């Protein structure tokens, strides 16, 4: 089983990774091409393109200028310990042991606007470039056109025949994967929370639930859909009535354990 998650806007650039091993991104030529495309942009250009404050735009312009194709432990950090946010709160990478991380390195992939596809321990440098950004480039008018089939081809390289691919990424990021070219069955879990008697997707909780499921798949070394359906962290449970073959639905009643 392989599974995908989104990156995050918020970055942790100071904490010490709990595992002192790393790998290198496989699409650095493409990353360099994107950096070269965006480097000439001024803070005002970036603020307009990404709808950022002047302060954030200035910070990210300096990041583009400082970005280097050669990634080392001096100028980079492993991705899984760098991204923050709701998904990564659920995943809680710092508490995964070495055996878990070894499994994650084989099974988990992080979609990225700049790096395309990252393994958990791939080194990365600080950046802000969301997949939905309309950045004109030599291959088109946005990042979806830039990446084309590059990401799906990389994913297919990792998949064994018949191996499940679980999509725990947001729509914005999974749109960068050409589903028609996938060589394996695709499973897209959905997480619903009860509010005022009705079950619905609540973004904050759904993001955290995706991270929780990624952690569950890692810790339990899940390989089948039946094993995935047993996910029961933080009060969620599989609901066969609302589920379909490719979209297992997990619900959490308001009476479930406290939501943190």
UniProtKB/Swiss-Prot annotation:
One of its GO terms (cellular component) is cytosol. One of its GO terms (biological process) is response to hydroperoxide. PANTHER family: PEROXIDE STRESS RESISTANCE PROTEIN YAAA, PEROXIDE STRESS RESPONSE PROTEIN YAAA. Belongs to the UPF0246 family. NCBIfam families: PRK02101.1-1, PRK02101.1-3, PRK02101.1-4. This is UPF0246 protein Mmwyl1_3597. It comes from Marinomonas sp. (strain MWYL1).
């Amino acid at each position: 089983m392989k599974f995908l998650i989104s990156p995050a806007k918020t970055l942790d650039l100071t904490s010490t990774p709990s595992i002192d091993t790393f790998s290198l991104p496989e699409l650095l030529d493409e990353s360099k091409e994107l950096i070269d495309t965006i480097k000439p942009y001024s803070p005002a250009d970036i603020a307009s393109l990404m709808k950022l404050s002047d302060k954030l735009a200035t910070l990210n312009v300096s990041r583009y200028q400082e970005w280097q194709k050669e990634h080392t432990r001096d100028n980079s950090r492993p991705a899984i310990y760098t991204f923050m946010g709701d998904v990564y709160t659920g995943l809680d990478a710092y508490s995964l042991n070495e055996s878990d991380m070894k499994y994650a390195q084989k099974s988990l992939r992080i979609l990225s606007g700049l790096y395309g596809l990252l393994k958990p321990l791939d080194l990365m440098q600080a950046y802000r470039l969301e997949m939905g950004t309309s950045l004109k480039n030599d291959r088109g008018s946005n990042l979806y056109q830039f990446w084309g089939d590059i990401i799906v081809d990389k994913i297919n390289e990792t998949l064994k025949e018949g191996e499940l691919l679980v999509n725990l990424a947001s729509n914005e990021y999974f749109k960068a994967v050409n589903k028609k070219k996938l060589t394996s069955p695709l499973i897209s879990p959905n997480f619903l929370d009860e509010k005022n008697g009705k079950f619905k997707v609540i973004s904050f909780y759904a993001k955290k639930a995706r991270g929780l499921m990624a952690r569950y798949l890692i810790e339990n070394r899940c390989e089948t859909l039946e094993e995935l359906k047993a996910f029961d962290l933080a009060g969620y449970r599989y609901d066969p009535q609302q589920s379909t073959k490719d979209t297992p639905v997990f619900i959490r009643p308001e009476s479930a354990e406290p939501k943190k």
